[in-house]
From Swiss-Prot:
Stated role: Catalyzes the NADPH-dependent reduction of beta-ketoacyl-ACP substrates to beta-hydroxyacyl-ACP products, the first reductive step in the elongation cycle of fatty acid biosynthesis.
Organism whose genome encodes this protein: Rickettsia prowazekii (strain Madrid E)
Positions contributing to substrate binding: S135
This enzyme's EC code(s): 1.1.1.100
Active site: Y148
GO biological process: fatty acid elongation
A GO molecular-function descriptor: NAD binding
Record bears the keyword Transferase: no
Record's protein name: 3-oxoacyl-[acyl-carrier-protein] reductase FabG
Length: 241
């Protein structure tokens, strides 16, 4: 049984979907959770469901100062989960520079800042767990998502590099790469589109946000203390690496 009692976790992109599921599970396992996102109303709704042992931090990851401040004003931090991200999809020949830049800025650069500032705190206590949420497309690629795929592949490379740098300080840095997870986006697909995707998944179904949350909880726990620099794939066998 995973026990996170006494730990403090910061989860970005916590207002819905995978981020919300991660926050709920870490809270259930005993951790105090700092839930962060750009939608204050959704964060409040999540807070009402959690009832206690939580803090809300509204943060715009496009603002680098806000990224740094999000960590600096956290008095105690044991677990960082970088889940927030955006998409801006189109074929590369139609993709404007600003469409590429904004995805990289939020999905990669902002997460680098969060990792860097968290490490500064974790080094002082010689303990920390960092989990960066990547994606199946960060490994496999996907047409129309050159910017998003680059950002998610970059997260994996960054995770490996940082894990080397902090391994002797009691800090582990890992990534989780979800596949097709049931969400508002997948709900908008028609039956033919859903069936085409499911046929590519050996387990024959979409994942759910809780599937990703349990992977994160494991990596955040002492049960995973000998695991660092790794990417845990949660994709129903859609990609085997």
């Amino acid at each position: 049984m995973i026990d996170l009692t006494g730990k403090t976790s910061l989860i970005t992109g916590a207002s819905s979907g995978i981020g919300s599921a991660i926050a709920r599970l870490l809270h259930k396992l005993g951790s105090k959770v700092i839930i962060s996102g750009s939608n204050e109303e959704k964060l409040k709704s999540l807070g009402n469901a959690l009832k206690d042992n939580y803090t809300i931090e509204v943060c715009n990851l496009a603002n680098k100062e806000e990224c740094s401040n999000l960590i600096s004003k956290t008095s105690n931090l044991d677990i960082l989960v970088c889940n927030a991200g955006i998409t801006s999809d189109t074929l590369a020949i139609r993709m404007k520079d600003q469409d590429f830049d904004k995805v990289i800025d939020i999905n990669l650069k902002a997460n680098f800042i969060l990792n860097r500032e968290a490490i500064k705190k974790m080094i002082q206590k010689r303990y920390g767990r960092i989990i960066n949420i990547s994606s199946i497309v960060g490994i496999a690629g996907n047409p129309g998502q050159a910017n998003y795929c680059a950002s998610k592949a970059g997260l994996i490379g960054m995770t490996k590099s940082l894990s080397y740098e902090v391994a002797t300080r009691g800090i582990t840095v890992n990534a989780v790469a979800p596949g097709f997870i049931k969400s508002d986006m997948t709900d908008k697909l028609n039956e033919k589109q859903r069936e085409a995707i499911v046929q590519k998944i050996p387990l024959g179904t979409y994942g759910i946000p809780e599937d990703v949350a349990y992977a994160v909880a494991f990596l955040a726990s002492n049960n995973a203390s000998y695991i660092t620099g790794q990417t845990l794939h949660v994709n129903g066998g859609m990609l085997m690496v």
